[in-house]
């Protein structure tokens, strides 16, 4: 055995190493170029002629309390019944002030004040005090691109709370705003 044999690997090891590196590179390329999954956007055919598109996310406010944020768009036939954001706080922890407006800010210049509004199929007596709902079509149709949002939710008996919404969630909401039922 010569000293060169110790430095230069055998040909079978060279091919094995190259194959391993090629496989690792291939997996990394697949992961890097994979399209994002919209697993949280769902379509419901609730009854004949009625379709609802929905995105549901779990978000946290500045006090680290969990909120469920659901954006849904309901069609009766080809007629849109509205695009709504429903916020659900933890029962017993918060009571939403339905007399106050939801404040939506982009952190730059855009600001919206959205009043409490129910969709036609939800009776007011059904929602408990930890739930609030807002018609947000004007907001989502006005957004040029998905950017972080700050939702300031008015509360009863305490100061308003702020919920930060990540751009990927806003992108789902914009996708729902731009979705139309198939004829």
Segments from the language model and where they lie:
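N-terminal secretory signal peptides that target proteins for export/translocation
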Residues: 1-15
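Short beta-strand elements
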Residues: 163-181
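Short, hydrophobic/aromatic beta-strand segments
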Residues: 95-101, 114-115, 162-164
